[in-house]
């Protein structure tokens, strides 16, 4: 999955071992390791210890759309989008899952995005949006 997706997103595979692959981009690197055999039947659970989701930035809205189309052609589950949201001016994104259920996002935010203002990000008007169930 990642060996097809990451080069499409501009990352270069610099290591491809038996159980580990490493891709590098301009300011991003991802190392992905095959899970141990005893865990192969498990799925990712967002509220367990670890990652909530990983977001990759695109250079344009068109690149977001192209990535979504690529993932559809790969049979990936697209959870939502591409859509625009109020997280930041021009915030355009989609959320998808890899084959293990790990949630990822690809977005485009024009200009400096969330770094353009001192106002903190507010993904929801619900003050408890980030509380675990």
Regions found by a protein language model. Give the residues of each.
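Short beta-strand/turn micro-motifs at beta-sheet edges
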Residues: 38-44
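Vicinal oxygen chelate
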Residues: 44-133
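A cross-family glycoside hydrolase active-site/sugar-binding cleft signature
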Residues: 33, 55-57, 81-82, 107
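Short, solvent-exposed coil/turn segments
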Residues: 16, 25, 47-51, 87-89
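Core segments of cupin and vicinal oxygen chelate
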Residues: 1-36
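Acetyl-CoA-dependent GNAT
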Residues: 34-38, 109-111
């Amino acid at each position: 999955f990642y060996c097809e997706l990451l080069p499409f997103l501009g990352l270069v595979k610099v290591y491809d071992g038996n159980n580990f692959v490493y891709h590098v981009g301009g300011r991003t690197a991802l190392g992905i390791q095959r899970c141990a055999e005893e865990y192969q039947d498990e799925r990712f659970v967002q509220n367990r210890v670890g990652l909530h989701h990983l977001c990759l930035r695109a250079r344009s809205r068109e690149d977001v759309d192209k990535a979504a189309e690529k993932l559809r052609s790969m049979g990936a589950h697209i959870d939502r989008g591409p859509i625009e949201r109020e997280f930041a001016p021009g915030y355009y994104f989609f959320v998808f899952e890899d084959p293990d259920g790990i949630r990822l996002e690809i977005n485009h935010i024009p200009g400096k995005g969330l770094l353009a203002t001192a106002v903190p990000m507010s993904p929801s008007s619900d003050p408890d949006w980030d509380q675990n169930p």
